[in-house]
Amino acid sequence: METMGFVPDYVPKQPYQSWGTEFVVLVEDSKDFISLQHIMVMYFEQDDGSVSKPIVVKHWRQDWKYQDSEINAYVGNNTWKKKRPLWAEKKGAWSQAVYQVDDSPRYQGYGRWEHADSFSSWTSSETWRPLPRREASIRDDYDVMIGTNIQTITPCLL
């Protein structure tokens, strides 16, 4: 959520909310490559207060590759450029490529897993990425987000 601007007289945009349940489906799991498809299941409240039937929507996908030799780096203005990392950058690292709903690239970065007794965690390099569709459709004052992804896996406690 925006709390301030960096130009005079800037007024933060009104926050919005969205709801849904997200499921992740394993598409492929081979030695050095994993592909995960995210699926959204949404319900909407109707004008009469009733709840709609579920709507299932293909959401984003993430592909993981071990010691990836090339990644797509977002450079702004809906443009990506191929980047070939140095061996030291990719050695022992997994890349995470995130794709939008239409399977076009969104962002990609390298990271390494840290394993502890109670969790495993992967932290990406800092990456540029385009605005999410939900923001790009209502915002025109910027077109790049800079982010770091952290994926943490913990034991399932039933």
Show which residues each predicted segment covers:
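Calycin-type beta-barrel ligand-binding domains and close structural analogs
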Residues: M1, S35-L158
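Short N-terminal edge-element motif at the start of the domain
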Residues: M1-I34
